[in-house]
Curated annotation (Swiss-Prot):
It is a single-pass membrane protein. Its main location: membrane. GO terms for molecular function: proton-transporting ATP synthase activity, rotational mechanism; proton-transporting ATPase activity, rotational mechanism. F(1)F(0) ATP synthase produces ATP from ADP in the presence of a proton or sodium gradient. F-type ATPases consist of two structural domains, F(1) containing the extramembraneous catalytic core and F(0) containing the membrane proton channel, linked together by a central stalk and a peripheral stalk. During catalysis, ATP synthesis in the catalytic domain of F(1) is coupled via a rotary mechanism of the central stalk subunits to proton translocation. Component of the F(0) channel, it forms part of the peripheral stalk, linking F(1) to F(0). This is ATP synthase subunit b. The keyword Transmembrane applies. The gene is atpF. Belongs to the ATPase B chain family. CDD domains: ATP-synt_Fo_b. It is found in: Cell membrane.
Amino acid sequence: MLESVLHALHLNETFLAMLISFLILVFILQQVAFKPILKALDERRQKVEESISRAENDLEEANRMRAENAAELAKARQEAHDLIARATKVGEEKAQEIVAAAQAEANRLKEKAVADIQREKEKALEELRSHVVNLSILAAEKVIRKNLDEPTQRQLVDEVINEVGKLPC
């Protein structure tokens, strides 16, 4: 009966034996080779997925760190800018204080010099008055001692003028 079915299907016994051998081989390969190969492929797929997941996590961490670094850099730049602004302000204030102190000192020295000059002027005027008084007294003594005629009077006035011209002013 099997022979008639095979013959009707145009199959021969060799083909049937080969088919049975192939099916047994597939079953054995499935038990022995396919399961380990599929298991190895599945493990490899899991490793690749884990690597991709780690890479994504690392990328997220790198992006987070880059954002933190950018924020810290911006903060440091702002702090440096603020520090420079404060230092500039303090420097300008110190410069203004120095200029104000120098102007005050210059004014004080000027006032002192003016006061010194005024004292010296008053002293010189006092000395001049003293000399003029002394010369006037001398002239009066000479007038009293002499009977003055006009040429003697002129000579006496010339002498007084010459002596006044010799005074240090």
